[in-house]
């Protein structure tokens, strides 16, 4: 768990996301509160529950992007799921407890990666010995091995093909246990029940360079204590886990509607104990969910937050509204973030030896077109910029391989020539932009 201050978290999010200060502050405080709770002693630590967040705002304003960037910052088990993917228990499909099972798998992968680094040096030595066995045979003399070891470390043997034995992948037969639908426990693998069946291996022919990472990871895994790894992962989920529930407005039951709404309300009811705190059984052990932070988000352009079950509303106490994007926001999105759209396209064209030069008035024109189409057709926020950029740079992208060494200047006239008429014609915009 990282110990960034809320100010540091917000400034980190500012590098990639324009505006939405309220949402950034809310997630920054929530993340810091996770760290604060872990500093408490004894029974008080158990009593401090996370304040779950509901982010409300139109599509394309940064809700999902905030969650994505937060995941990288948190250094904690993080899972993003769409609420629409789940069904009520008893219906065909995945039930909400699968969220926690998936989160545990994420945590195990995270902890394993971290622990591999701790045993990296020993794993490198063991992997090197296996490569030497493949090159000169296990019974070769010390002088021969030393000679090949020097060549191996110098990179002279990187392109040489060797045959190595590696762990077979998870190709175990899968089946469902009668009376326990796969939706509830996930498909059961015979490998999970009978272990790895004596550690099945298969022979593969690879270059020395390609085999290096595979062998180092295998040797590192042999040095790890799997039981301890799983226990650490479960503890990380229980104390630091974060779940981002997207599209929560799509499971709202709207007044005067019936039919499929039953299942939607059922999903909300199933989410209640998960968010409030329950114990979920996974194949790795029981997981308590009391201290997992849930961040729900939705556009709520048809439904309202008040259409959620009252109990679910109560379990999402912090409300944050994200604002629709203005023309100025669109302009900033094109230029300010570290991986802004313009920087991406300039870098892509550079691979062809072509220089792209955007004038200030071109950036203004791109923002104007995006705002105009959003206001007349359908407001999809910043995602509209991608459509407009692709349309504007269509010709340049097509001819770039034949124009090596040339410079293309994109100005306001160039933008208007390519998309200006489409933006004005609402009927065409509907289909093209």
From Swiss-Prot:
GO molecular function, one term: proteasome-activating activity
Residues annotated to bind ATP: 18, 60-65, 246, 311, 383
Main localisation: cytoplasm
Lineage: superkingdom: Bacteria
Pfam families found in the cross-reference section: AAA, AAA_2, ClpB_D2-small
Keyword Nucleotide-binding: yes
GO process terms (BP): protein unfolding; proteolysis involved in protein catabolic process
GO cellular component, one term: HslUV protease complex
Keywords: ATP-binding, Chaperone, Cytoplasm, Nucleotide-binding
Disulfide-bond pairs as recorded: none
Subcellular location as annotated: Cytoplasm
Subunit comment: A double ring-shaped homohexamer of HslV is capped on each side by a ring-shaped HslU homohexamer. The assembly of the HslU/HslV complex is dependent on binding of ATP.
Family to which this protein belongs: Belongs to the ClpX chaperone family. HslU subfamily.
Known role: ATPase subunit of a proteasome-like degradation complex; this subunit has chaperone activity. The binding of ATP and its subsequent hydrolysis by HslU are essential for unfolding of protein substrates subsequently hydrolyzed by HslV. HslU recognizes the N-terminal part of its protein substrates and unfolds these before they are guided to HslV for hydrolysis.
Protein name: ATP-dependent protease ATPase subunit HslU
């Amino acid at each position: 768990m990282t110990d960034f201050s809320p100010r540091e978290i917000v400034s980190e999010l500012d590098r990639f996301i324009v505006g939405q200060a309220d949402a950034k502050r809310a997630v920054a405080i929530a993340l810091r509160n996770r760290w604060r709770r872990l500093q408490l002693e004894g029974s008080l630590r158990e009593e401090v529950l996370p304040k779950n967040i509901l982010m409300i705002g139109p599509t394309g304003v940064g809700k999902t992007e905030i969650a994505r960037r937060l995941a990288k910052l948190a250094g904690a088990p993080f899972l993003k799921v769409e609420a629409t993917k789940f069904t009520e228990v008893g219906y065909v499909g995945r039930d909400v407890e699968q969220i926690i099972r998936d989160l545990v798998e994420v945590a195990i992968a995270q902890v394993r990666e971290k622990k591999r680094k701790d045993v990296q040096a020993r794993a490198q030595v063991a992997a090197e010995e296996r490569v030497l066995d493949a090159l000169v045979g296990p019974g070769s003399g010390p002088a021969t091995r030393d000679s090949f070891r020097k060549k191996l470390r110098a990179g002279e043997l990187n392109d040489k093909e060797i045959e190595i034995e590696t762990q077979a992948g998870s190709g175990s037969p899968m089946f469902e246990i009668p009376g326990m639908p796969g939706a509830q426990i996930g498909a059961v693998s015979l490998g999970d029940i009978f272990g790895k069946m004596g550690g099945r291996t298969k022979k593969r022919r690879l270059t020395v360079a390609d085999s290096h990472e595979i062998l180092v990871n295998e040797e590192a895994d042999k040095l790890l204590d799997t039981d301890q790894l799983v226990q650490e992962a479960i503890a990380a989920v229980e104390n630091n886990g974060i779940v981002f529930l997207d599209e929560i407005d799509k499971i709202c039951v709207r007044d005067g509607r019936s039919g499929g709404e039953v299942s939607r309300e059922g999903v909300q009811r199933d989410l209640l104990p998960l968010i409030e705190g329950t114990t979920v059984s996974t194949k790795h052990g029981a997981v308590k969910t009391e201290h997992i932070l849930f961040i729900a988000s939705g556009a709520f352009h048809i439904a309202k937050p008040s259409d959620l079950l009252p109990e679910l509303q109560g379990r999402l106490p912090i409300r944050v509204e994200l604002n629709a994007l203005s023309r100025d926001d669109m302009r900033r999105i094109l230029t300010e973030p570290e991986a802004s759209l313009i920087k991406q396209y300039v870098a892509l064209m550079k691979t062809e030896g072509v220089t792209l030069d955007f004038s200030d008035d071109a950036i203004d024109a791109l923002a104007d077109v995006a705002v105009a189409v959003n206001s007349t057709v359908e407001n999809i926020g910043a995602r509209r910029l991608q459509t407009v950029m692709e349309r504007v740079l269509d010709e340049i992208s097509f001819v770039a391989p034949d124009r090596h060494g040339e410079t293309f200047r994109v100005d306001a006239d160039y933008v208007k020539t390519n998309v200006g008429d489409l933006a004005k014609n609402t009927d065409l915009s509907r289909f093209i932009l």
